[in-house]
Curated annotation (Swiss-Prot):
<keyword id="KW-0479">Metal-binding</keyword>
<feature type="active site" description="Proton donor; for delta-elimination activity">
    <location>
        <position position="265"/>
    </location>
</feature>
<dbReference type="GO" id="GO:0008270">
    <property type="term" value="F:zinc ion binding"/>
</dbReference>
<dbReference type="GO" id="GO:0006284">
    <property type="term" value="P:base-excision repair"/>
</dbReference>
<dbReference type="InterPro" id="IPR015886">
    <property type="entry name" value="DNA_glyclase/AP_lyase_DNA-bd"/>
</dbReference>
<protein>
    <recommendedName>
        <fullName>Formamidopyrimidine-DNA glycosylase</fullName>
        <ecNumber>3.2.2.23</ecNumber>
        <ecNumber>4.2.99.18</ecNumber>
    </recommendedName>
</protein>
<feature type="active site" description="Proton donor; for beta-elimination activity">
    <location>
        <position position="58"/>
    </location>
</feature>
<dbReference type="InterPro" id="IPR035937">
    <property type="entry name" value="MutM-like_N-ter"/>
</dbReference>
<dbReference type="GO" id="GO:0034039">
    <property type="term" value="F:8-oxo-7,8-dihydroguanine DNA N-glycosylase activity"/>
</dbReference>
<keyword id="KW-0238">DNA-binding</keyword>
<dbReference type="InterPro" id="IPR000214">
    <property type="entry name" value="Znf_DNA_glyclase/AP_lyase"/>
</dbReference>
<keyword id="KW-0862">Zinc</keyword>
<feature type="active site" description="Schiff-base intermediate with DNA">
    <location>
        <position position="2"/>
    </location>
</feature>
<feature type="active site" description="Proton donor">
    <location>
        <position position="3"/>
    </location>
</feature>
<keyword id="KW-0456">Lyase</keyword>
<keyword id="KW-0234">DNA repair</keyword>
<feature type="binding site">
    <location>
        <position position="89"/>
    </location>
    <ligand>
        <name>DNA</name>
    </ligand>
</feature>
Amino acid sequence: MPELPEVETVMRGLAAKLEGRRLARVVLARPDLRWPIPEGFVQFLSGARVEGFRRRGKYMFMRLDRALSVLIHLGMSGRMTIDSAPLPHQHLTLETDDGAVIGFVDPRRFGALDLVATAAEDSHRLIAGLGPEPLDDAFSPATLASALEGKKTPIKAALLDQSVVAGLGNIYVSEALFRAGILPHRLAGTIGRGRAGRLVPAIKATLTDAIAAGGSSLRDYVQPSGELGYFQHAWKVYDRAGQPCERCPGPAACAGISRTVQSGRATYFCARTQK
């Protein structure tokens, strides 16, 4: 599933193409994705001007001049295309007044499209329970330590809980925990202010670096332009089981990156440097 950096990258690509443009033609190929698409969806979008975009966690809002926003969720395999020939499983096509063509392609149909009043975006059922944005100033060591206090789950599982912090997924949690030197299996309630003081900057730096690289291309994800993301080339632990840890002096000190499974998801870490 695309995580925060991939969604941010997609949103920026769409904003560059769509902001200020009118939607001259809207084609919806099916009435539902993961959930039913609202009746009148095409009519509400047709002729509307795109005023801007906003990301919340792994969700995007395309804001229209009708006090309405289109919620877009890429799900597991969804992607947006710009000026591409129609693709299989392209469920939504937007054509602008200057001739740009935007497509929403989702082979597995775990994505979502919905309409919400712009003023009520944060009240949408998919948004209301989300935790803070990790790149906002309000996400601090103090707020994270408070959210984790008393939790008996491993820190990795806690960070994947979207009510604790929004937008993180398996890749970036693994990478941030490595940067912070924190073992993924450590109980979340033992993090405290001290370790949170390392973890919060590590999360922010990991996400910032990933956005700058256009995200991580893994299976289905590409940028709207069709380009791959490049952050997968900078992974320190994710999908690197058995490979050397860059922080360790060599095989005599470290067996390399370890892999375990937590809650059905692969976890990667260095047992020597993460505690």
